[in-house]
Amino acid sequence: MQERELRALIAQVKDGKLSRRDFVRRMVAVGLTAPMAGLMLNHAGVAWAQAAFTYKPTKAGGGGSLKTLLWQAPTLLQPHFAVGTKDQEACRLFYEPLAYWDPEANLVPILATEVPSYEGGTLAKDGLWVVWKLKQGVKWHDGKPFTADDCIFTWQYAVDPATAAVSSGSYRDLKVEKIDDHTIKLNFAKPTPYWADAFVGWKGMILPQHLFEPYKGDKSRDAPGNLAPVGTGPYKFVDFKPGDLVRGEINKDYHVANRPHFDTIEMKGGGDAVSAARAVLQTGEYDYAWNLQVEDEILKRLEAGGKGRVGISPGGGIEHIQLNTTDPWTEVDGERSSVKTKHPTLSDKAVRDALNLLVDRASVEKFIYGRTGYATANFLNNPARFISKDTHYEFNIDKANQILDAAGWKRGSDGIREKDGKKLHYVYQTSINAPRQKNQAIVKQACEKAGISIEVKAVTASVYFSSDAGNPDTYPHFYTDLQMYNTTMPEADPAFFMNQFCSWEVAAKANKWQGRNITRWRSQAYDDIYRAAEKELDPVKRAALFIKMNDLVIADVVVIPVVARPKVQGLASKLQAPVSGWDNDFAQIADWYREA
């Protein structure tokens, strides 16, 4: 579709001759997805669509207790330290951003009164600023008023290097200006096509200045609020047992009418995905189970129990294997996997190419994930306009052997290939979870046929995905050769998702392993393309830049994509719970209710 045709269609929407839904459908047909189509209309001055979800309760409270299960247990309740998705989810019970992404990919205001727009004079056409108008009358859970000062403080808190906030990248290249007590202006250092980043979604959760001010910078980890949140959300904090249980109660002063529906909320952590699915779908002990990474065959069997249903939310999640570019077995200045080292064998491109051929993605899809994951060669799989057509995957043990032979990796007496005294022996870690252990087994079996020794390691999920900087077994530490997990894409734009390969995002001791570049891969070419995409306002040119980034990562075998995974949840039969594939599951927790 040419630019002229696109502009004509947008004009038809603005004139009321073409419905927003029909426009979105046409964009999807040519490789765009709902979130990007919505952003395009918004940039053209068309208002966001009304959410499709209908909230039926006519008063707040009265819904009893909502019992939810997260088999990866939360370990902290501070959104700007929440490396793991499960910690972000727990924070959404109590904290809120200015806006969130709903399941239909609409940007919905929550602490803001409206979404910025060109027509409203709150969005710059040159991409250099955006104005957010804040709700008035909103109170923190302790009764203090929510104002622009809290937004400015959150920005200052996140960008302070001593804080080591995982959200820092969203706030780094902007300045926040206070217009009045309920209006802020974000001034960007350069044209910013994706302005809905800071203060939006999980990275946008706003902190109360009056409670966190004494704990800025290097004191940030000492704040009582890290474990006992005081937010503006629908539920007030009651109790937290890290790695086990989060409890909240209704916020009777909540700023949205007739919400929330439930009187109390419980977020139980631990166990495994299968037991979580069973507790909702078969026994009905719980109302909601998060992130059901369970074989599809088992899910279908559990659904037959009649107590609940499986929900699938399309998004950009990718189950992938990471290859460590550094040496996890050598310590430098008190840290392993230091960027001052390089991996002794994975630094050989031939070895990485061979490993890429030894991952049987088709079998993983067919025998493990089914409708909950499809095989892919790409790291960036959504929105559709950003999917590369230049990559492909192949499972070929013979070709892997040929590559290793040609590169001089000879089999030793034990069958393991070696060269210059270095063996192809790798520790391959992931979280304890049946599909992941089956995935590990499939990879291990193929690797052994190519003379590569694989030692599998399975870490308790609550430990592996912990945000604890002192825990050496977390995935950001990456103290093994290979590791696997699902990384989510919690927003419609790939900018944040793809910054996890930027050199300035390297996870290290210096930033308390809060950096998003877990593989420690560094590429000047990638950095340059990413910087270009940050300021490119033409959506077509920008899409091409993200495709180039994906292709660089895949060509260098920095990661091995396995399956693209939508979000999968278990919901009790009567629970109405909008879940977005572009935000946290609990982003709309205020709208959840139980039908009579």
Please name every model-derived segment.
Residues 73-120:
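Protein kinase glycine-rich loop
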Residues 167-216, 239:
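Surface-exposed binding/hinge segments that line
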Residues 23-48:
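N-terminal export signals
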Residues 29-33, 91, 555:
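Hydrophobic alpha-helical transmembrane segments of multipass membrane transporters and ion channels
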Residues 39-71:
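C-terminal segment of N-terminal export signals and the immediately downstream linker at the start
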Residues 35-44, 97, 158, 367:
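Hydrophobic membrane-targeting alpha-helices
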Residues 562:
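Active-site-proximal polar cores
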Residues 2-18, 22, 26, 50-60, ...:
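Extracytoplasmic/periplasmic ligand-capture domains
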